[in-house]
């Protein structure tokens, strides 16, 4: 692994292409290297995980609307990409399939994560890369290599370059990862991938208002849009077009004007040319449908529920988490919406105060029932909810940013004060399902998650067929990859036909 320095180049100088981060990303995407067996297994796990959460969200309004958008772009030769839930005989332009399937995967906020200098859901790469693989008739081995590239690039960028301190959304690291992954998928030249990466970054820098205040369904659309943008960038470059460069180091580029400025150095870790791509092994999924930093708080809520405390005797609940938890989903965000029962589902799944209150009261968590308006307005919940506050704890922030993965912690400590002055303390280093947690997710757990989320949505035989394809991922033919999708019976799937072509 080599740390690459990235900073704005000097005024009046030309930064050689080989010294630009986008070129180094492109070189990684176009290098031939061995595949790691554990990493390949994890690719399969991520496919299962994405399918699970997409099934669970298949008829939610944002997903239905995204599907309606894509339905207007059927592929004229019927050799495009599939839409999640629809038969493989129906294919659509890969860009629009990437959007629709990306929304389905992201909607429930329940798939994988990687948290470092910035935040990410690297599973967001999968819908776009898979759509490109289906349209270009790629086999399972090519798809696997491509996804390993996408994970490596996004997670390297998230490790080295913080976006959120400048209120830039993390999809700015997703789009170049998709472009690089598609470069690997199609065996494109380094020059082509370089141009596509530059174009993707140029178009994907959006603000974090999508995750602040009144959070809407755009939180689910944002990664799908980034994937669509990246595929369009690759397509444009394949026609011979070029892109703004150097997109990271230029005097008027991202670092100079959107991030920390021309005098700051970033360090991005990329594996050497002979090393296998293993970053995916440092990603981790969610057991519960909520922002990742709330996962451990849900598990803590279960532990508090088991104590059987009299909730009426609770006077104060101090949650001591990391900087991220406090400022993004805690009271440090200064978002009154996070304390409001009338807030959107997208806002509530980013409110650790609400999440802890519900998990504590119920001793359970459900991706739908835990967010209903009735649930949010329960008087006992509102009372407990308003007593919960967060306060950044430096030890948790330090553990969050630990450079050694084995020392990372994404948990918190909760101090409950009772009316008699007694205190009850619950602490958890990592969510139970985390690879460092009490019960790390393995292949059987991902399959179980898929069966649970798909219950009553897809037929068990269809889920078994999909699992069988994933189990044989590296050996899948192009025809198999074209069917790497779960079909939902027509009577269980809403909004499956479009009366229009185009957005309006």
Please annotate each region the language model reported.
Residues 32, 56-57, 129-136, 179-185, ...:
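Well-ordered alpha-helical scaffold segments within catalytic/enzyme domains
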Residues 1-119, 218-228, 235-504:
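Terminal-appendage/accessory-domain detector
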Residues 133-228, 232, 246-247, 251:
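Glycine-rich, mobile lid/loop segments that gate access to catalytic sites or pores
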Residues 101-157:
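Hydrophobic alpha-helical hairpins/lids featuring a short glycine-rich hinge
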